[in-house]
């Protein structure tokens, strides 16, 4: 992907060189402490344990939709698949998320959780063009955010895609038609 260049303009113009964080946890801590400022998401929990892993960070956005954050220091790691796995888990465990929201933000917010467009924000130092194409094909609310660090005091976030997500709908396999069965009807089916 293309590289953003940052310049310090003074008496002499000087390019600021970018870098990545040394440890993924450094990036995670900075974002968790400033999640609402950076992304408009209220922070709920770090290292949220689930049955088969842990989500790096979890929060709730201004529309009361769940937001999962996954961080990777480099682009070669499997952040998108991991985020999708956690999203599916979350949709199957809504009650667990609601309890977390009650604990952190209260019942009023928990009663307003919007499950129609939950979000995964994947943050890494880069993504391939194939990553961007893949998430755009999924029709899920997955955002790819590239980060760059400039010195100790500047952090840049570049949003690489604008997801066009289909709302998650509740599907039911229960028939809505009612039928009256008698013992004779069941015996006829067995014959």
Regions found by a protein language model. Give the residues of each.
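Charged, terminal alpha-helix-loop-beta segments
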Residues: 1-191
């Amino acid at each position: 992907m293309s590289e953003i260049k940052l310049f310090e303009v003074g008496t002499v113009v000087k390019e600021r060189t970018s870098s990545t964080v040394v440890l993924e946890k450094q990036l995670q801590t900075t974002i968790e402490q400033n999640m609402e400022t950076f992304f408009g998401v209220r922070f709920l929990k770090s290292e949220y344990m689930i049955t088969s892993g842990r989500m790096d960070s979890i929060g709730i956005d201004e529309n009361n939709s769940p937001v999962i954050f996954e961080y990777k220091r480099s682009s070669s790691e499997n952040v998108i698949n991991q985020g999708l796995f956690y999203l599916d888990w979350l949709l199957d465990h809504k009650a667990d998320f609601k309890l977390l929201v009650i604990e952190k933000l209260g019942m009023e917010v928990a009663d307003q959780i919007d499950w129609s467009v939950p979000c995964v924000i994947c943050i890494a130092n880069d993504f391939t063009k194939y990553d961007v194409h893949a998430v755009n094909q999924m029709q899920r609310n997955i955002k790819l955010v590239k980060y760059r660090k400039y010195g100790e005091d500047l952090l840049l976030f570049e949003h690489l895609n604008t997801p066009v997500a289909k709302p998650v709908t509740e599907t039911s396999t229960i028939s809505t038609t009612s039928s009256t069965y008698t013992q004779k009807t069941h015996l006829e089916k067995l014959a």
